[in-house]
Amino acid sequence: MYEWLNALPKAELHLHLEGTLEPELLFALAERNRIALPWNDVETLRKAYAFNNLQEFLDLYYAGADVLRTEQDFYDLTWAYLQKCKAQNVVHVEPFFDPQTHTDRGIPFEVVLAGIRAALRDGEKLLGIRHGLILSFLRHLSEEQAQKTLDQALPFRDAFIAVGLDSSEVGHPPSKFQRVFDRARSEGFLTVAHAGEEGPPEYIWEALDLLKVERIDHGVRAFEDERLMRRLIDEQIPLTVCPLSNTKLCVFDDMSQHTILDMLERGVKVTVNSDDPAYFGGYVTENFHALQQSLGMTEEQARRLAQNSLDARLVK
């Protein structure tokens, strides 16, 4: 069934470009930029990927991102991801990038954006993959820093379709960023937000009611709140679910416990995505395949999940 799943046309709506940095490319960029790494070789780095929770993953993720320095680096990162998409028949992508991860290291905003945009344009022209780019704020940083990032983004407003919210969830509720999101919407941006991954269902309510998001990234803890489930079904609010990520970060102890198919059968508009595939052991097809292997996902369910991803695009 893997080949059939691979050939299924699909969109990816929850993907962090920095999270596609495979160990081989990380080492190549470190060499190109003459950066000393704390790992001796690719295999040592792969072993470091045995993290146990979101914070351990984020610590490794931000350390790895340090090799991204030049416009060419960001182009190469994005282009490598798009080639994976082509191989898996991902026909549309709406990736996140985290400018603060780079501007806080002294990399100019425009350098980051130029490399990513050039690769996305080439992906559309040469690979036929349509796209919309989402600027994501880091929630463990302050509201003031998010406002500053929005200031930096406004001269390039035509480069983005939406703003989002990611990073360490617990203790950083969506309400912390309500004013930034209000301002972003007034400037013409759509909004999305990570909520209900490690954080409680209340964070999903806040994302919907205070940030007024078009869709929820993750959202799996909605299953704990029947009233919230009813709203997601009634309003057909998409959830961009990332199964391999959820098990790797221990949101679920095992894939057999994942609720995505239960939510699908109840009428929630769930989609399948890879989140940070270099770190979580698989791109979109591998996520679909894991559901088939562990939960007995049928072809009919896979078709619905793929169609949901195409229907939930912000760029139609």
Swiss-Prot record:
The GO biological-process annotations, alphabetized, read as: adenine catabolic process; hypoxanthine salvage; nucleotide metabolic process
Kindly identify the residues recorded as the active site: 197 (proton donor)
Keywords (A to Z) from UniProt: Hydrolase, Metal-binding, Nucleotide metabolism, Zinc
This entry's comment on the bound cofactor is: Binds 1 zinc ion per subunit.
User: Site annotated as Important for catalytic activity: where?
Assistant: 218
The cofactor(s) it depends on are: Zn(2+)
Return the InterPro entries for the record. Answer: A_deaminase_dom, ADE, Ado/ade_deaminase, Metal_Hydrolase
* This enzyme's EC code(s): 3.5.4.2
Q: What positions does the entry give for Zn(2+) binding?
A: 14, 16, 194, 275
GO molecular function, one example?
adenine deaminase activity
Catalytic activity as recorded in UniProt: adenine + H2O + H(+) = hypoxanthine + NH4(+)
Q: Detail which positions bind substrate.
A: 276
Enzyme class per UniProt:
hydrolase
**Signal sequence segment:** none
- Pfam families in alphabetical order: A_deaminase (PF00962)
Protein task:
Catalyzes the hydrolytic deamination of adenine to hypoxanthine. Plays an important role in the purine salvage pathway and in nitrogen catabolism.
Task: Give the protein family.
Answer: Belongs to the metallo-dependent hydrolases superfamily. Adenosine and AMP deaminases family. Adenine deaminase type 2 subfamily.
Q: What is this protein called?
A: Adenine deaminase
Q: What's the source species for this entry?
A: Pseudomonas aeruginosa (strain ATCC 15692 / DSM 22644 / CIP 104116 / JCM 14847 / LMG 12228 / 1C / PRS 101 / PAO1)
